[in-house]
Amino acid sequence: MANYFNTLSLRQQLDQIGRCRFMQRSEFSEGCDFLKGKKIVIVGCGAQGLNQGLNMRDSGLDVAYALRQAAIDEKRDSFQRASGNGFTVGTYKELIPSADLVYNLTPDKQHSSVVEAIMPLMKEGASLGYSHGFNIVEEGQQIRSDITVVMCAPKCPGTEVREEYKRGFGVPTLIAVHPENDPQQQGWDIAKALASATGGDRAGVLESSFVAEVKSDLMGEQTILCGMQQAAAVLGYEKMVADGIDPAYAGALIQFGLEAITEALKIGGVTNMMDRLSNPAKIKAFDLSEQLKDMLKPLFGKHQDDIISGEFSRTMMEDWANGDANLLKWREETGQTGFENAPEYNGKIDEQEFFDNGVFIVAMIKAGVELAFDVMVEAGILPESAYYESLHETPLISNTIARKRLYEMNVVISDTAEYGNYLFANAAIPLLADKLMPSIGTELIGKPFAAASNSVDNKTLVAVNKAIREHGVESVGDTLRGYMTDMKAIVEAV
């Protein structure tokens, strides 16, 4: 199979990568009614499979799970998750032939084999759903012409899809219809119903394309969402311990600090996050973030270029064929880092303390969000898509780190995201360790920022505030956050 994106003309590529329209609430007035009474079979019961299925069932849809015979016979985790939550579970042959919609929520690396196995079993005129377009765009999967192919892509790990739904909210979601497979012209009705059933319409839905989703999703998860947070955690912890900070406190400051800091980001963007700092600390964090952007822009650019060209996908699929040799090696190395093995902290850290003692973390988040947004927009991805991939999903990933550190993050994200995360972090960590960290002291990570005076130059502060508030990610973010009127604070203190 050939990379689908690379078979398109330049004009078609630009058209597909630039597809993005923020949908109005009124477009979801019928909720998920289009799928009610239809038989939906989810293939796979991992993080996305289980949690989307739970939301869909709670929204009134008929959901069952199709698993491989071996998974059922051996009562593997996927079988235990589905059956333990009261779902009907059967084999492909038992469930697929009667399904109106088959929702493929298996890991990316399994998509080709799964689709080849289920497609002959699907009835005439059925629909096939994805939550990530890698199989269609990067692998070039060919789908039977009578089958409608849609996407419903929540912009966060599966666990957060469920948690936000239970809070009465949802997560921003991209929907798309594969232009080669919409024979009955019902693709958008199906995709909209899926977004409503999983809770996405409560947080904002973008009408997108398979291409735009893949190219922006890969960039976001590799850089700010996972790679920058892993780099910040590893570097920040090592620096604090080297400078005499209690290892238990250092671990907690990062583990829970990322969540607290990015919660401010979620509620009010970079502006709100930076406003949580004192004026002297804000100016320092701004200057540090600009320094970080200068250092990291070539790396961000390389990742985006490799994603657009297909080079990233090619090398990752080579690793798949090699038994995930690099992925497993990098996973083991991450598990051996100081941060992952930090002792538990028994004290209490006030929520404001995460900001006061974590100026370095704030600067890393600001730099990562703005760089990822800028580089995506430069590549032709529209600002709305770039915002969701660079800013809104960041706190949702931070929430996973707060649970069980980097291990939890890398467990709940996809293997594709995990591979890209390591690829980025493994380049960013030594770069920053050499060029930046020698200049970082405990006043920037570990202890309160202590300026010689709380006084600041008014013109400097005005210029800093102007630069923060007029950045593109803040302009589009202010509009999109206006849709999220039901957001609930989830962080207080530890």
Curated annotation (Swiss-Prot):
**Keywords assigned:** Amino-acid biosynthesis, Branched-chain amino acid biosynthesis, Magnesium, Metal-binding, NADP, Oxidoreductase, Repeat
Needed cofactors, names only, are: Mg(2+)
- The positions annotated for binding Mg(2+) 1 are 217, 221
Q: How cofactor binds (record note)?
A: Binds 2 magnesium ions per subunit.
Superkingdom of origin: Bacteria
The UniProt entry, under InterPro entries, shows: 6-PGluconate_DH-like_C_sf (IPR008927), 6PGD_dom2 (IPR013328), KARI (IPR013023), KARI_C (IPR000506), KARI_N (IPR013116), NAD(P)-bd_dom_sf (IPR036291)
Tell me the route in metabolism or biology where this protein functions.
Answer: Amino-acid biosynthesis; L-isoleucine biosynthesis; L-isoleucine from 2-oxobutanoate: step 2/4; Amino-acid biosynthesis; L-valine biosynthesis; L-valine from pyruvate: step 2/4
- Stretches assigned to the KARI C-terminal knotted domain: 209-344, 345-487
Question: EC number(s) on record?
Answer: 1.1.1.86
Task: Give me the residues that bind Mg(2+) 2, please.
Answer: 217, 389, 393
Q: Which GO terms describe its biological process?
A: isoleucine biosynthetic process; L-valine biosynthetic process
Q: Which residues form the KARI N-terminal Rossmann domain?
A: 14-208
Residue numbers annotated as active site: 132
Q: Where does NADP(+) bind?
A: 45-48, 68, 76, 78, 108-110, 158
Which family does the record assign?
A: Belongs to the ketol-acid reductoisomerase family.
Q: Which NCBIfam families match?
A: ilvC, PRK05225.1
- Annotated protein name in UniProt: Ketol-acid reductoisomerase (NADP(+))
- Record the organism: Pseudoalteromonas atlantica (strain T6c / ATCC BAA-1087)
Q: Tell me the organism's taxonomic lineage.
A: Bacteria, Pseudomonadati, Pseudomonadota, Gammaproteobacteria, Alteromonadales
Which gene name belongs to this protein?
Answer: ilvC
